[in-house]
Amino acid sequence: GSGKTPHVEYLIRLLHDKVKIAVLSRGYKRKSHGYVLADENTEMSDIGDEPFQMHQKFSDIYVAVDAKRVRGINNLQSNEETKDVDVVLLDDAFQHRYVKPGINILLVDYHRLIIYDKMLPAGRLREPLSGKSRADIVIITKCPKDLKPMEFRVLTKAMDLYPFQKLYFTCINYDTLKGVFTGKELKDPKDYHVLLLTGIASPKQMEHDLKPMVKEMNSLSFGDHHRFKNKDIDRINEAFEALPEPRIIITTEKDAVRLREAEGLYESVKESMYELPIK
């Protein structure tokens, strides 16, 4: 929930004109096994929702999945079709010790700062705080856009980084709503009753940001990477039908990938469902 995919996409936009990029991911909850390189016939279930999202958005990069990252990197470097790769971006490998990266980037959620957290099971940390010393770059994500200079200084001191480590701050920018099934854009949702539909790790930020932008908002949340079953689709249909007119559903790009493959959504739901891209 720290914003790995938007930051990987930012790096893709930053680098793709200069170098040939491959994204290598674990491919969480995919149905395939081993190493898979995405092509024009690849489906979401082959590589997972987030890799598939990037595969759809960026046609000039390679997207591959492999739980064994070293094997995945070796395949990218040795296979004829991908041997022109200059940079491999791994979206969740800070603790994958078999990989020795050229640059380590650590993302820290502004709302869940690791300096105030504890190790599992008391907190959410998977390793001691001292592990942050492996990072070349630390990014505090999901910051308020009006972060004051004093808070920059306080956070910089609290993070207690080494001189060689760079610290950056990022915030979320929302793009124009786009129809999940129709492709139509919706510039302003302020007059709509909204069902916010999410299956992500940390939906509260999105709820907080969207609430002032719409007439009224109800939320329907599922677990991260949730695969929508028939009973879930029924809940979505019923929750949408219960909203007053005019009404729409807003969901994330990642959820839209899975919802497009779901069966049983009412046509009225499909026509009124929008994804909210973030950068």
Model-predicted regions and their roles:
Residues 1-40, 145:
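Walker A (P-loop) phosphate-binding motif
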Residues 20-24, 106, 193-197:
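Conserved beta-strand elements of the Class I
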Residues 27-163:
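Phosphate/Mg2+-binding loops and adjacent switch elements
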Residues 64, 108, 170, 220, ...:
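Hydrophobic residues at beta-strand termini and immediately following loops
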Residues 78, 151-160, 210-211, 259-270:
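Short, aromatic/basic amphipathic alpha-helical patches
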Residues 113-246:
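C-terminal accessory "lid"/substrate-recognition subdomains
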Residues 223-227, 268-279:
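Short, flexible loop segments at boundaries between secondary-structure elements
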Residues 247-254:
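Acidic beta-strand-to-loop metal/phosphate-binding motif
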